[in-house]
Amino acid sequence: MRLELYDEVALLFHSEEKDIYFVQHMIKNIFCIKKIIRNRQDLQVYELLKNHPHPNMANVIDFAYSHDKTIIIEEFINGCTLDFRISQRPLHPKEVESIMLQLFSVVSHIHKLHPPVIHRDIKPENILIYQGHITLIDFEISKRYLPDCVDIMKCGSVGYAAPEQYDGRSNQQSDIYAVGILLREIVYASEQTEPMLSILHDIIHTSTQIDETRRYQSINEMKKEFLQRFHHRKW
């Protein structure tokens, strides 16, 4: 990675864990995002994401270690967070459907990689939305799913992290739990909360079971039931 080619235009975010810059490639004249993360990330996750892009995921352009920090260059994505969007006005049921189908698609994509990638921090703040198109971002605590490996650290966001994540375990069902919590949140932020809850309650209930073995065993199983209950309804 030739970091000197990326001119730092603005600091977008600063914390103890990371800095995020809006940068410009001085030769290609394109704008990107540069993340400086103050620990060593699993670069094999970024290798998988770079080699297997998806329309609802920011493209990974480059990555490297530098002085015990991880540097990630990603595609710049326009838009606001889903968290901000739902604070502005209620969602129409068709918007809820569109958001969820896009989310199912990208989560299914990362879960089907070899090995699967577990996001571990799916929440409205980590989803950008622009003109109805969503982008799942922030893979900093994501991991490759290796069945016999225990997580080194407990991670995730309170309210969205599955119970097993607090015990140092995470798998595909952990992401399904977070998707279920997110579904519940955007249903409550919709124009027609009560009728939507009546058809989606069982999906939310199943996906957010404390016992991970009682959740959907794949995100596509959850998507299939969502479509059966939600699709072709007139709102």
Where are these regions (language model features)?
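Activation segment signature within eukaryotic-like protein kinase domains
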Residues: 99-100
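Catalytic-loop of the protein kinase fold
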Residues: 111-129
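Conserved activation segment of eukaryotic-like protein kinases, specifically the C-terminal portion
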Residues: 150-164
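Conserved HxN/HPN-centered segment at the entrance to the catalytic loop
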Residues: 53-62
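ATP-binding glycine-rich loop module of kinase domains
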Residues: 10-43, 47
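Conserved catalytic-loop aspartate of Hanks-type protein kinases
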Residues: 175
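Conserved short submotifs of the Hanks-type protein kinase catalytic core
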Residues: 67-81
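AlphaC helix of the protein kinase catalytic domain
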Residues: 82-91
